[in-house]
From Swiss-Prot:
HAMAP family: Ribosomal_bL25_CTC. This is Large ribosomal subunit protein bL25. The gene is rplY. One of its GO terms (biological process) is translation. Belongs to the bacterial ribosomal protein bL25 family. CTC subfamily. SUPFAM superfamilies: Ribosomal protein L25-like. InterPro entries: Rbsml_bL25/Gln-tRNA_synth_N, Ribosomal_bL25/Gln-tRNA_synth, Ribosomal_bL25_b-dom, Ribosomal_bL25_C, Ribosomal_bL25_long, Ribosomal_L25_dom, Ribosomal_uL5_bac-type. CDD domains: Ribosomal_L25_TL5_CTC. NCBIfam families: bL25_bact_ctc, PRK05618.2-1. Part of the 50S ribosomal subunit; part of the 5S rRNA/L5/L18/L25 subcomplex. Contacts the 5S rRNA. Binds to the 5S rRNA independently of L5 and L18. It comes from Rhodococcus erythropolis (strain PR4 / NBRC 100887). GO terms for molecular function: 5S rRNA binding; structural constituent of ribosome. Transmembrane segments: none annotated. Keywords: Ribonucleoprotein, Ribosomal protein, RNA-binding, rRNA-binding. GO terms for cellular component: cytosolic large ribosomal subunit.
Length: 202
């Protein structure tokens, strides 16, 4: 585990919205650590360092927490971000151990260019897989290079990293290659609202 993922976590003794606001004002993120039948632990972690790790690894980041001198490895399970100011409001962390399998949602990234005259519609941006807790892929790539109109890629056709197992429905549609709209289609789409407005005014 890289030292860049280390965070010093402070056990919280105050709770409620007021305490959470004070923690954030002091540059901390309120978190809850749970799992393995242990009682949930309420912690604060440094906001700047936590945000840096999430930017580098995504929302499934693995953390090494220093909790009062004891090291604990954890998976970032969920992150709540303020919708306007974009700071991290809260996070849930899951206790993990070496060799353990976890079920997580991983981002699906489309790469390559489909055939000329086509448009790629991505129906699923994430996919649920089971993976080693310490070897979670940052993303799963799906190539559309040269694909023709009518081609579909299902979850069962994704190339998963070694040791990972698909948990989503095998028939989940990931990518659908369709005909790109023509200029006539675009013009017709632009004219329709104008025609509707004219009809309403008549």
């Amino acid at each position: 585990m890289s030292e860049e993922n280390n965070l010093v976590a402070v056990v919280r003794t105050e709770f409620g919205k007021g305490a959470a606001r004070r923690a954030r004002r002091d540059g901390q993120v309120p978190t809850v650590l749970y799992g393995h039948g242990e009682d949930p632990r309420h912690l604060n972690v440094p906001a700047r360092d936590f945000a840096r790790i999430l930017r580098a690894q995504g929302t499934n980041a693995i953390l090494t927490l220093d909790i009062e001198g004891t090291e604990q490895v954890a998976l970032t399970k969920s992150v709540v971000v303020h919708p306007i100011r974009s700071y991290i409001e809260h996070a849930d962390l899951l206790v993990i151990k070496k060799g353990e399998k976890v079920t997580i949602d991983v981002h699906v990234v489309v790469v390559g260019d489909a055939a000329a005259g086509t448009m790629v519609a991505q129906d699923a941006s994430t996919i649920s897989i089971e993976a080693d807790a310490l070897h979670i892929p940052e993303q799963i790539e799906v190539s559309v290079e040269g694909l023709e109109i009518g081609t579909q890629i299902l979850a069962s056709q994704l190339e998963l990293p070694a040791g990972s197992v698909l948990q989503a429905d095998a028939d989940t549609l990931i990518v659908n290659v369709v005909a790109a709209p023509t200029e006539a289609d675009l013009e017709e789409g632009a004219e329709a609202p104008a025609a509707d407005e004219a009809a309403e005014e008549a």
